[in-house]
Design a protein with these regions (language model features):
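Single conserved hydrophobic/aromatic residue that forms the stacking wall/gate
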Residues: 1-7, 11-12
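Mid-membrane cores of alpha-helical transmembrane segments in multi-pass membrane proteins
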Residues: 13-22, 43-46
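Hydrophobic alpha-helical transmembrane segments and adjacent interfacial helices
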Residues: 20-30, 89
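Alpha-helical transmembrane segments in multipass membrane proteins, preferentially the mid-helix core
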Residues: 25, 46-68, 91-95
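Membrane-interface helix caps and helix-loop-helix hairpins in membrane proteins
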Residues: 27-38, 48
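A cytosolic-side transmembrane-helix exit/cap motif
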Residues: 32-37, 55-67, 131-135
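Alpha-helical transmembrane segments of polytopic membrane proteins
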Residues: 39-47, 116-120
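C-terminal transmembrane-bundle signature of multipass membrane proteins
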Residues: 53-56, 76-139
Length: 139
């Protein structure tokens, strides 16, 4: 996957592609379109690629070069992706556990939809508040 720099702007094609791979393969596993462990692994690899890019890859380098405000925003983004998005694999494990090596996740007493709703609330509301706070700080 290429670094994709164009002038002073970063081409986000690779990150969008990784996001699509993460979502589509996760859906395929949840929908029972093949082995859930295989689809979950492919989805997880795309997730870890995005985490890597934000914390150590081209996204981090560009943010650092853009100044402290952008680097600070990138760090907040990194934490949301690392911690906030980690809620979704838990829902995936709960929803696809039957007959898999991780079948114990089906018995932890949580409903997959509730886990996803909590993840959505944490990520959407929390991320919006962080972006708002960073914009106020920059103004």
């Amino acid at each position: 996957i290429s670094a994709c720099l164009v002038g002073s702007e970063m081409c986000i094609r690779d990150r969008i592609l990784a996001s699509v791979v993460m979502l589509v393969t996760g859906y395929m596993g949840e929908a029972g379109l093949g082995n859930a462990t295989v689809w979950g692994t492919v989805s997880a690899l795309a997730y870890f690629y995005i985490v890597y890019e934000v914390w150590m890859g081209d996204v981090k380098k560009l943010a650092t070069n853009a100044g402290s405000a952008v680097a600070s925003a990138n760090k907040a983004l990194g934490w949301f992706i690392l911690v906030g998005w980690a809620i979704y694999p838990l829902g995936y494990l709960i929803g696809t556990a039957e007959g898999q090596w991780y079948a114990g996740f089906a018995n932890i007493g949580l409903d997959m939809d509730i886990v996803y709703n909590i993840g959505d609330a944490v990520n959407k509301i929390g991320f919006g508040l962080v972006i708002y706070a960073l914009s106020r700080k920059a103004a």
